[in-house]
Amino acid sequence: MMRLEKVFYLTNPTTKDLENFIDMYVFKYILILLARCKVFYEGRAKSQLEEGDRVIIIKPDGAFLIHKDKKREPVNWQPSGSSIIWEVEDNFFILKSIRRKPKEELKVVISEVYHACAFNCEDYEEINLRGSESEMAEMIFRNPDLIEEGFKPISREYQIPTGIVDILGKDKENKWVILELKRRRADLQAVSQLKRYVEYFKNKYGEDKVRGILVSPSLTTGAEKLLKEENLEFKRLNPPKGSKRDLKHNIKTKKTTVLDEWL
């Protein structure tokens, strides 16, 4: 995998490499795939797009777009808030974008990927009433007691083999604390992400040395159930209001993966 300052990419990845790549960056960065695929839509109607070269775009808010080599509009798309799932079946990489209300499913069967790109897009000119996960992280670094008394955040966007940890820190008992941040209602996929990160740290440091906390304004019923089953925690926290521009310099200075003093 090649890395630039804000861009991570793979050229002609294997199915396994692509699976790991999407697992690491989906819902965090903008994903762009240049791929050969078939597309199936089922919802208010049914449609099928035969195999061809397409540009697939998955945005952090769940928006899913498929472009051909002509025209401005995507040939298929799903709105923000859609769930994204993926699997490997008979050597095909399958992406699904699922919208629950109204019920719609966009299924992309990928036979070949020429290029996969993850772009860390930070648009500070945009004014949001609801802040991004980056702004949530900045807010937590400024006031760690929002999570709990004695919490010490150490690193943001800490990369491990199973993904990118939003915030890594320690509690007052010196246990590792992994925070998964969601600016909207957290679903099953958010819990699954957190579970993978916690399992990695438990394998490294021990079962009783690691905690995982999902931080978001609310939870789906399924997410709440899975959190309890996996002995993970939930902290209700709304993202900050205001301009991303105001936090531009603070956000950049807080990003670090230097943990030598803690490890």
Swiss-Prot record:
Record-linked Gene3D superfamilies: 2.70.180.20, 3.40.1350.10
Entry GO CC: cytoplasm
Domain of life the protein comes from: Archaea
UniProt-listed Pfam families: NucS_C, NucS_N
Subcellular location: Cytoplasm
Keywords: Cytoplasm, DNA-binding, Endonuclease, Hydrolase, Nuclease
GO molecular function: DNA binding; single-stranded DNA endodeoxyribonuclease activity
UniProt keyword Membrane, yes or no: no
EC number in record: 3.1.-.-
Family matches, as HAMAP family: NucS
Family: Belongs to the NucS endonuclease family.
Function as written in the Swiss-Prot or TrEMBL entry: Cleaves both 3' and 5' ssDNA extremities of branched DNA structures.
Name recorded for this polypeptide: Endonuclease NucS
UniProt organism field: Methanocaldococcus jannaschii (strain ATCC 43067 / DSM 2661 / JAL-1 / JCM 10045 / NBRC 100440)
